[in-house]
């Protein structure tokens, strides 16, 4: 009896569905180079139709009200060259392999608006010049949606991935954040960032029989930043891959962790940081994008 030939793995979804790639907090310039390189390479291979950024890709350290802790932080406080330019270069790279990017603003990007609104007189005129929304949106070649941190209406800022699945930056930093998010979201599943921890909570509606879940894929920033030097974190590097039916009524997710500069995709392929490290190093040196 002849053995059945094994099919060659095919990256990407089958007809009738598409891939949505979820990218959590990055905190440029305090990003983890190896984790980011893995993400860039995986994005190249998978070519998701939609790419959703959960916010805090800019640390906005220059706009922080917290005191500095080191000379390294002082050098990092160059908002345009140290944060905006690398982020724009990264967004341009992602545009090469996706049809749409959704950027959900985080509390760190909101630092800019919060500080500018405290200024008086002519200083208010600089608000638009330093707005993360304007700085990151200008010059985009693909469809780009920026969702502000503070809503213009009573509806909380969110992005609808599927009929019963939303993405938000994060509503709480609680220890059991996933359970709290699901409690708040009620009859929606929710993927969130903000907490930097990999966490999941699932519940079933006993009346309708539907299952809902809330989860955080982790983060892409340094796992032990300077301000946590004497407080070991339980942060984890990771992303989420969500396969969504084109009618957006059904979906399933896979959230690979990134460990020691590598991760494994759903088809078993191992992605390593060295495959895209050259781009990350160029991104860090870029002055414009």
Residue spans of the language-model regions?
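A structural signal for short, well-ordered beta-strand segments and their strand-loop junctions
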Residues: 22, 51-54, 100-106, 148, ...
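Conserved beta-sheet core of the metallophosphoesterase superfamily
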Residues: 164-256
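Metallo-beta-lactamase
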Residues: 124-164
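Short acidic-hydrophobic surface loop/beta-edge motif
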Residues: 11-12, 154-162, 202-205, 263
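Core catalytic region of metal-dependent phosphoesterases/phosphodiesterases
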Residues: 23-140
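Acidic, histidine-bearing metal-coordination/catalytic regions of metal-dependent phosphoesterases
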Residues: 1-31, 285-289
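Feature recognizes metal-dependent phosphohydrolase scaffolds
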Residues: 6-22, 42-51, 57-70, 92-96, ...
């Amino acid at each position: 009896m002849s053995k059945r030939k094994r099919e060659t793995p095919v990256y990407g979804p089958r007809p009738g569905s598409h891939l949505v790639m979820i990218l959590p907090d990055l905190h440029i310039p305090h990003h983890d180079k190896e984790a980011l390189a893995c993400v860039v390479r995986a994005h190249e291979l998978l070519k998701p139709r939609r790419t959703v950024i959960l916010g805090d890709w800019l640390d906005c350290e220059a706009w922080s009200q917290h005191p500095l802790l080191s000379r390294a932080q002082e050098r990092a406080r160059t908002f345009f060259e140290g944060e905006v330019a690398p982020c724009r270069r990264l967004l341009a790279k992602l545009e090469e392999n996706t049809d749409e990017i959704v950027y959900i603003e985080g509390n760190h990007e909101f630092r800019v608006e919060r500080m500018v609104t405290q200024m008086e007189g002519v200083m208010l005129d600089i608000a638009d010049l330093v707005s993360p929304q304007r700085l990151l949106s200008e010059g985009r070649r693909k469809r780009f949606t920026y969702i502000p941190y503070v809503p213009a209406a009573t509806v909380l800022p969110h992005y609808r991935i599927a009929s019963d699945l939303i993405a938000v930056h994060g509503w709480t930093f609680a220890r059991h954040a996933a359970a709290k998010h699901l409690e708040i979201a009620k009859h929606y599943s929710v993927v969130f960032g903000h907490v930097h921890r990999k966490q999941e909570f699932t519940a079933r509606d006993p009346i309708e029989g539907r299952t809902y879940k809330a989860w955080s894929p982790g983060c892409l920033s340094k796992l032990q930043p300077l301000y946590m030097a004497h407080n070991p974190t339980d942060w984890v590097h990771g992303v989420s891959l969500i396969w969504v039916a084109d009618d957006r009524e059904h979906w399933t997710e896979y959230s690979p962790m990134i460990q020691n500069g590598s991760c494994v995709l759903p088809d078993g392929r191992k992605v390593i940081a060295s495959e895209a490290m050259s781009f990350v190093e160029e991104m860090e040196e870029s002055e414009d994008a």
